[in-house]
Amino acid sequence: MADVDDFDSLSNAELRAKMLAQGLPNIPVTDSSRKVLVKRLRASIGGQASPAASPKKTNRRETLAPAPGAPSAPAAASTPVDKLDGNKVAPATKARRTITAAEAKEPVRRLPEEAIRRRPDEADRLRSEEPVAARKPTTAPAAQPVQTRRTSTSSGSERKVVEPLRKPETIVEQPASSKRADREENYLKVNSLIVLESDEEEDEQLVQAADLVEQEHAARQKTTKLASSGTTTYEYKSKVVEPPRRQVYEATAAPVLPPSVPSARAQTTSSTRSYDYASNPAPGRYSSFVRTAAQGYVTAEAPPVASYSSSYKRTYANELSDDTDSKEDQYESTFARNLARLRAERIGDRISPYSRRTLASGNAGSGSLGYEPRARRSLRPNDNSVSEAFNRWLNSLEQKYHIKSKLFIVLLVLLLIGVYYIFY
């Protein structure tokens, strides 16, 4: 232990020589690596493995430094491996490598001490004898893995030769497969003939079905033509209208009627156009009757349809009104018309009554379609006096701050102060 404790007092060169004598690799000793190398040296002297050295680095340095002593260890280690497991080649080689790395350390590290202590002649004699001893065991076991390989390859080749003998068995089965192929070909030929015959039958059925569809379609077209010719039937009834009025909106042109209709139209100057649903002879699901804007209203000595004109003017008050009022008004009841008039009166003028005027007759409240609305007046009243504005301002202050009671208290205090100054 005294030798171990003296490492801290040694210089770098002495410590390096001590490491080489112990069998450690030739590493230069510096102040930074001194502690690590001292630990490795103490571990090697104590019989422990160096903690910081990896096996790869030690193997490289050990094989390079002592050249003659290295082959003796693997040679000695290779003999028991071949004897224990001679049949398996790959595990034997792996076992050699791992055992040599472990066993080669001690003789390599202790060779320099023996060489230093003994004479140089004895060291040379040991180095010359060790390779001779290493050559003897390596020659004999080297042949064993070769023999095992030869036996393994020969056994594998024998198995491979035996396997092709089974091929004639498959050749014997070929005529049976050829019979099956012939049967399948014959079966396909028979089926193909059946498929062709069935295609012809389907084609004939398709042609017959197409003819039936064409015949049914032609019959339907004939029935629809007959039904459409009798759907547009109109019944005109003469009726006296009181009071008469003029149309003040622009109506769309009426559809062209059948040639039998104008004769009935020429007989009456004032008539109501109504559609009689009971007189429709069409048994179909849908009717071709289309109701237009020129039907369903009452005319009283009105000019022809083409001469209708509108004197309705667009103003700011009715700018946002519906554009289809003229079309929808004919379906409205009198109650709906009166309600619309009352709403217009409320919206228009808030002081004077607002009336809907008919442009043609000038009667107010008659429920006519066209009217000329007046411009809306401003919401501010006309008479704004200063006293009324001041009263409104006082009322607002009273509602918000209750200022009357506070003003009364202030005036009472001022009155008391005045009385005090007057009498005292």
From Swiss-Prot:
Cite the post-translational modification comment: Phosphorylation at Thr-63 by aurA may be required for exit from mitosis. May be phosphorylated by Cdk1 and Pka-C1.
A Gene Ontology molecular function term for this protein is: transcription corepressor activity
Q: List the residue ranges of the region (Required for binding to Med and germline stem cell maintenance).
A: 1-50
SS bond partners: none
Effect of mutating S54A: Loss of phosphorylation by Cdk1
Identify residues that carry Phosphothreonine: T63, T324, T358
Q: Which UniProt keywords apply?
A: Cell cycle, Cell division, Chromosome, Cytoplasm, Cytoskeleton, Membrane, Mitosis, Nucleus, Phosphoprotein
Mind listing the GO biological process terms from this record? cell division; germ-line stem cell population maintenance; germ-line stem-cell niche homeostasis; negative regulation of DNA-templated transcription; nuclear membrane reassembly; oogenesis; positive regulation of BMP signaling pathway
Ranges of biased composition (kind: Basic and acidic residues): 103-133, 157-170
Cell cycle listed as a keyword: yes
Region described as Disordered: spans on this chain = 42-186, 259-278
Which residues, renumbered to this chain, carry the PTM Phosphoserine? S44, S50, S54, S152, S192, S198, S321, S326, S378, S385
Summarize the impact of T63E.
Phosphomimetic mutant which displays a decrease in the number of mitotic cells
Which residues lie within the region annotated Required for binding to Med?
271-400
| Tissues of expression | Expressed in all cell types of the germarium and testis. Expressed in nurse cells, follicle cells and oocytes.
Q: Does the keyword Ribosomal protein apply?
A: no
Gene Ontology cellular-component terms listed: centrosome; chromosome; cytoplasm; endomembrane system; nuclear envelope lumen; nuclear inner membrane; nuclear membrane; nuclear periphery
Cite the residue spans of the region called Essential for nuclear membrane localization. 406-424
Tell me the InterPro entries matching this sequence. Answer: LEM/LEM-like_dom_sf, LEM_dom
**Cited function:** Inner nuclear membrane protein. Involved in the attachment of membrane vesicles to chromatin during nuclear assembly, and is probably required for centrosome maturation and cell cycle progression during mitosis. Essential for differentiation of certain tissues and the maintenance of progenitor cell populations. Required for the differentiation and maintenance of male and female germline stem cells (GSCs), as well as the maintenance of somatic cells in the GSC niche.
Quaternary organization: Interacts with Med. Interacts with Lam. Interacts with aurA, alphaTub84B, gammaTub23C and gammaTub37C. Interacts with Nemp.
This protein is called: Otefin
Q: Which organism is it from?
A: Drosophila melanogaster
